[in-house]
Each structure stands twice: as C-alpha cells, then as structure tokens.
Amino acid sequence: MLKIVILLSAVVCALGGTVPEGLLPQLDGRIVGGSATTISSFPWQISLQRSGSHSCGGSVYSANIIVTAAHCLQSVSASSLQVRAGSTYWSSGGVVAKVAAFRNHEGYNANTMVNDIAVIRLSSSLSFSSSIKAIALATYNPANGAAAAVSGWGTQSSGSNSIPSQLQYVNVNIVSQSKCASSAYGYGSEIRNTMICAAASGKDACQGDSGGPLVSGGVLVGVVSWGYGCAYSNYPGVYADVAVLRSWVISTANSI
C-alpha cells in the first residue's frame, strides 16, 4: 500500500496525514535523483532548524520574513526554532537567526493538506549578499510542462535517516493542478485548488525538503508539501500553490 509522504524532513517516518481512509501518511521530504549545488545558485534557500537540527526548508521573502510549509510548524514553539541562511551546508556557515514568531495559514488542514503554507518572522534581519537574496512570489502559475527546480537538504532516498550536508537540487517540470488531478495521475480529488504539482522521471523532493522552494522563471511558484512516496512515476510531488496563496503571504508578512 502506498505511503502518503508529507515532505517534512525532520524525521524518518513519523505518521501524519492525508486521505485514503485508514492510511496514515508519513512525515517525509527529500531531493531524489538530484545533484549537489551551492547556495549562490539558490540564495533564497534556508534551513529551518529545530533545536539546532535541520527540520525543513524555506524561502527568503524579505530581510526578516521566511515562507515555509504549515506542516513544518505543528506542535513547535518559536523559541525552539532558528534559520540558517547563506550557506551551502545546513550545519555550518552563513548566518543563523532566531525565529521571533510564525503563523500558519488559518485554513491549513492536516488531513487534506490544503493551504499548507506558513510565514516566519525572524528576530533579526538578514543582510542580503550573493548568498542571501529574497525571491519574488509568483503572480500566476507557469504552463503545464514548464521547467522548474526544487532544492533542499532532504534525504536522498525514501525512508532514509540521513540527510546530505550539502545543498541538493533537482530539475523538474510543472504539472498543472488540473492535470495533476486528472486520470493521467493517481491522486484524483486529493489535489485541491491550493496545490500545484511537479515531476520528472526518477526525481522528486522528499524527507527534509518540506517547506522548501519550487522555482520556475525566477519566482517562487510552490512550497514543498506532500506526495505518495518520492519519485513514484504516477504520483508527482505536490506543492502549496504560491500564486493562489500569494495574497495571504503578503498580508501575513505585513502583520505578523
């Protein structure tokens, strides 16, 4: 039976959720089939850390605002969180900033994974450089099949305990919400209007990549959210749809 993998990354396979009745999904999230890269190629990428250990990814929206996934911030206090920015390695280099506050989307549902997006406010502002840059939010979705990239420090095989020290990325192609929900793939009605998908043969995000960026055309189009396994041929990776959720991110960033 397929496991529903919610791309969280903090752990190997903690249970958490979405649909088929009686099937509890795993918290998961990794770059499968990817390549090592450096932060200068993905300067908006951050490592969200719980008690000093990599937990999820995220994206720099402004000097003190990070965008990540709501499922990354369940049952956790801001005081236990920090962000490492500007480093190719999650465990060293760059700068570390404490988390002052965060807000999950009020409509987030752990059973359906709708509205899986959150905003973090840092206790101190990041200084922008070649290795730390903000990324703009998509205003519309790229066309089905458009080139995209996803990055992170998640595990490199499904169910693995270990994560790479160096940032990884993989090139994928956008699968539109309507296409992802169609009979061409296996999700059906589980794909909702706050989701967008991406896929490539043998490539995907997985444990540890949750909350991280899906980028196409130089803008943030998705936030790593969930999927059935990692890199399963009939099940693309599923992401929070940034274009659809953009107004919430902007208003929350201005008020948190």
Curated annotation (Swiss-Prot):
Extract one GO cellular component term from the record: extracellular region
Question: Alphabetically, which GO biological process terms does the record hold?
Answer: proteolysis
Reactions mediated catalytically: Preferential cleavage: Arg-|-Xaa, Lys-|-Xaa
The active site of this protein is located at 71 (charge relay system), 116 (charge relay system), 210 (charge relay system)
* Chief place of localization: secreted
Q: Which positions correspond to the propeptide?
A: 23-30
Q: Which SMART domains match?
A: Tryp_SPc
- Site-annotated residues for Required for specificity: 204
Task: Give the keywords, sorted.
Answer: Disulfide bond, Hydrolase, Protease, Secreted, Serine protease, Signal, Zymogen
What the entry lists under Gene3D superfamilies is as follows: Trypsin-like serine proteases
Query: Signal peptide span per the entry?
Result: 1-22
Which cysteine pairs are covalently linked by disulfides here?
56-72, 180-197, 206-230
Q: What class of enzyme is it?
A: hydrolase
Q: From which domain of life does this come?
A: Eukaryota
Q: Where in the cell is it found?
A: Secreted, Extracellular space
Where do the Peptidase S1 domain residues begin and end? Answer: 31-254
Please give the Gene Ontology molecular function terms for this protein. Answer: serine-type endopeptidase activity
The EC number on file is 3.4.21.4
Q: Which family does it belong to?
A: Belongs to the peptidase S1 family.
Recorded protein name is: Trypsin alpha
Protein's organism: Drosophila erecta
